[in-house]
Amino acid sequence: MEEFKRNLELDRSQQHDFIYPLIFQEYIYALAHDRGLNRSIFLENTGYENKSSLLIVKRLITHLITQMYQQNHFLFSGNDSNQNKFLGYNTNLYSQMIFGGFAVVVEIPFYLRLLSFLEAKERVKSHNLRSIHSIFPFLEDKFSHLVYVLDILISHPIHLEIVIQTLRYWVKDASSLHLLRFFLHEYPIWNSLITPKKSSFSFSIRNQRFFLFLYNFHVCEYESIFVFLRNQSSHLRSISSETFLERISFYRKIELEVFTKDFKAIIWVFKEPFLHYVRYRGKAILASKGTSLLMNKWKYYLVNFWQCYFYMWSQPRRIHINQLSNHSLDFLGYLSTVRLKPLMVRSQMIENSFIIGNASKKFDTLMPITPMIGSLSKAKFCNVLGHPMSKPVWAALSDSDIIERFGRIYRNLSHYYSGSLKKMSLYRIKYILRLSCARTLARKHKSTVRAFLKRLGVGLLEEFFTEEEQVFYLTFAKASSNSGELYRRRVWYLDIICINDLANYE
């Protein structure tokens, strides 16, 4: 990153096209390739087929540069029947490398801006801010005191050109934007990369990083309204364009529609100091201490605002108003509830004593077992009832590879669901994976499960006892002799940057 700082000089006012040359640098694609191979894979390693792709990076870059200097560069035949070719090469392989390189390039200015922000705030551990688990301690602290919550399902995918226009306000590099527009328009399966799927979005596995970046960037843009409302709730006065994250035209639209009317009559609706908002991909939660009437006003305001100013078609039925006391939040693979915890207090006076019953609110996070079994069933580890099955497609692997794959799946699930209040659901998942592993090995060796386990011994169990569990018991076993208290111990980690594939059952 220091090399990027020296090359880019971090001065966009003097250098507006610093991103464009990076697209034709080989080390950018090598960096993207290494990121792809080193990412956390929960089910199986799918990167072996790409090990030789670095050998053709130079050929790809040379071809792109050659096309740029031709008069008919980037011209495609409209009646070309070969839809599996891209710039004369295989679509899957080259598009994966191109979009991987694009993802690295477009993330550079945003990452540098984040570093400057953290330096100004004297925060050096930026990686801690990326952890998904960091959301849940925030929910524990804030949501216990709130009343209503809005479950928001983000609108259907937007038009490609709107994404490009939104990106223009941050990346002032016309050449890069034109090249990006070309690749996205010419990519033959663009419409299948971002498609509505229940309450979330489905992305191409190969190009997931790049399209997640574009999607999250656009969503963050229309989330900037919360910055505006947060400032207005604390002081009713004119605000600078910086509050709108450099959206000058956006600021003018708001100024014409809002500030020219009776300002106080409109803004009082949003003077709510207890308003909290969290989002992950296609699902968001907006919680408040206000009344049901206030939440309804929030609901229809957001729908109209997103449709009018960001062309995000959203229907009111995609936003549900629920009361936290009798509603469970389905968010990030956890089932979160706010329950009343009874508490008896004994008050002693001079001659008399009183027992006072009191109840406090507590935010609980649980692992939903039914959707998790559904995910395991889709992956062919068990049937819909949760009965373990063998994995025939893995029977051709070696015994050590089979055991390692099953063990890796459980270790990742155990790591992700370490914050669950009750571990019984996790123990059931452990049982399913262990028996599925045993049946897969028995199927491979044409034996019964009982005979195979008797011959294998305890070696199979070691892969399913995670390092986190060992540290967990060594740390807390001495501090608490009550097994029930140890059973409900929750641990949040700061190194989880993506939701587990099996946990993403939406």
Curated annotation (Swiss-Prot):
InterPro entries: Domain_X, Maturase_MatK, Maturase_MatK_N. It is found in: Plastid, Chloroplast. Its main location: plastid. One of its GO terms (molecular function) is RNA binding. GO terms for biological process: mRNA processing; RNA splicing; tRNA processing. GO terms for cellular component: chloroplast. Belongs to the intron maturase 2 family. MatK subfamily. Usually encoded in the trnK tRNA gene intron. Probably assists in splicing its own and other chloroplast group II introns. This is Maturase K.
